UniProtKB/Swiss-Prot annotation:
List of residues binding ATP: K253
Residue numbers covered by motif 'HIGH' region: 9-19
Protein name: Glutamate--tRNA ligase
NCBIfam families xrefs: gltX_bact
Needed cofactors: Zn(2+)
Native organism taxonomy: Bacteria, Bacillati, Bacillota, Clostridia, Eubacteriales
Cofactor note (record): Binds 1 zinc ion per subunit.
Subunit description: Monomer.
HAMAP family: Glu_tRNA_synth_type1
């Protein structure tokens, strides 16, 4: 048997971190077993589904390194891969269930069902459809049709039975059918509801394993009933734990925590995200001794559902930042500079052409922050002093360090910088010799220069900073205090 798994996002917005986590585990499972990973779109929300969101989902999954074997963009033997292009299939199987007696036409009005819900709520019991249309005679159906009522199709849930399945993550689960009301599979307008459409999709795409979030556990017995009614084998199910923030709440869209695109734009590396997310709910071999860093190849080779926990996992941004910083530091300086460039350009510090025209210098600038940043988005705030003509001055620091007392020292340093060989050792020798001659401490001499040329009290090494800012800019920035 060839393992076939799928991920089925809705193209109504950027793909959520939780959906990406589910996609990752499905992808790892498929690749580990030499199987197929299928991407399809649940796009029946016609008002909100957009082609541009499909492109965003494609891009974000590819950015992470998650590829698919069949999908809307590349096709495959079991397409189409959008639900809106599969409506004839749903109608075909709905008709089959209608003819076999597993579903029936329901003419109940919204008002009738709302009244039933209020009654159930008042009685303190969960709502279940009462079965008002479960056994209508042909004459009763004809009368409703004559009134102009358009029927939905409801599944006839058998009574007094137990649905059993062995969850690949949680073990045996049993659900009595008496706890499941007769459910709608097709709306009056001919559009399928989720549980019916997903079964038809999985059946016709030969899906063998369904790995998804624990929120789908209540859907599983409903879907098993549909599989059985259609006469198809039931796939194996595994339900993954929820993902929460450290406060055990949902990841926040407002804080830029919910969409994978947010992390991409904030300067996280795809390999760091992939590694970090693989550890949410899965324990790799060797974790007991602190093993946390795994390559994509190691993840594929070692992924096993037996090491997946049913407990919810905590998306700890601090740990992600730390892990991303480690991955950044593993990059060569050339690689780091290439990764940094788009963030520097988007911050308006320079154009790509300007950076590439002085690429060796640009790399030297990036070397000053290579060991300091945890995300690529942090880079501009550290390197703006090298790239901007004007700097923002910390007024408190200026009042403290740029006093009348520094003028003689600044005058001598500026004079020396005009003619000194422009190298870090020569600059350092010049400044230190003047400092020593004038009997100044490093704090009395170095910190004023740093504040004057960077506008702040913290920067990379002072002499490297002077060298990289450049002779002309350094002299311009020191001039007001000479």
């Amino acid at each position: 048997m060839t393992v076939r798994v799928r991920i089925a996002p809705s193209p109504t917005g950027p793909i959520h971190v939780g959906n990406v986590h589910t996609a990752l585990f499905n992808w790892l499972f498929a690749r580990h077993h030499g199987g197929k990973f299928i991407l399809r779109f649940e796009d029946t929300d016609l008002e909100r589904s957009r082609p541009e969101w499909e492109q965003v989902i494609f891009e974000d999954l590819k950015w992470l390194g998650i590829d698919w074997d069949e999908g809307p963009d590349i096709g495959g033997p079991y397409g189409p891969y959008r639900q809106t292009e599969r409506l004839d299939l749903y109608r075909k199987y709905a008709q089959q269930l209608l003819e076999s007696g597993h579903v029936y036409k329901c003419y109940c009005t919204k008002e009738e069902e709302d009244a039933d819900r209020r009654e159930a709520q008042a009685a303190g019991r969960p709502y279940q459809y009462k079965g008002r249309c479960r056994d209508l005679t042909p004459e009763q159906q004809a009368a409703f049709e004559a009134e102009g009522r358009k029927p939905v199709l409801r599944f006839r849930v058998p009574r007094g039975e137990v649905i059993r399945f062995n969850d690949l993550v949680r073990g045996p689960i049993e659900v009595p059918t008496d706890s499941i009301g007769d459910f709608i599979i097709m709306r009056a307008n001919g559009m399928p509801l989720y549980n019916f459409a997903v079964v038809v999709d999985d059946v016709t795409m030969n899906i063998t394993h369904v790995l998804r979030g624990e929120g789908h556990i209540p859907n599983t017995p409903v879907q098993i009933l549909i599989y059985q009614a259609l006469g198809f084998p039931v796939p194996e199910f595994g339900h993954l734990g929820h993902m929460t923030n450290p406060e055990r709440g949902k990841l926040s869209k407002r804080k830029g925590e919910a969409a994978i695109r947010d992390y991409r734009e904030q300067g996280y590396l795809p390999e760091a995200m992939l590694n970090f997310m693989s550890l949410l709910g899965w324990t790799p071999p060797g974790a007991e001794s602190g093993r946390e860093f795994l390559t994509k190849e190691e993840l594929i080779r070692e992924f096993d559902l037996s090491r997946v926990t049913k407990a919810s996992s905590v998306f700890d941004r601090n740990k992600l930042n730390w892990m991303n910083g480690v991955y950044i530091r593993k990059k060569s300086l050339e690689e780091f500079a290439e990764l940094a460039l788009p963030f520097v350009v988007s911050a308006g510090l320079c154009t790509e052409e300007q950076a590439r025209a002085r690429w060796d210098w640009f790399k030297e600038v990036m070397a000053q922050v290579h060991e300091r940043v945890e995300t690529l988005a942090e880079i501009p705030q550290h390197v703006d002093i090298f790239l901007k003509d004007e700097i923002e001055m910390d007024e408190k620091a200026a009042r403290k360090f740029l006093t009348e007392a520094v003028k003689p020292f600044f005058q001598r340093v500026s004079e020396g910088l005009r003619s000194v060989e422009w190298s870090v050792p020569a600059i350092e020798q010049l400044v230190r010799s003047i400092q020593e001659e004038m009997g100044l401490t490093p704090k009395e001499s170095f910190q004023p220069i740093r504040v004057a040329i960077t506008g702040r009290t913290a920067s990379p090494g002072l002499f490297e900073t002077i060298y990289l800012i450049g002779r002309e800019r350094v002299l311009e920035r020191m001039a007001p205090y000479c």
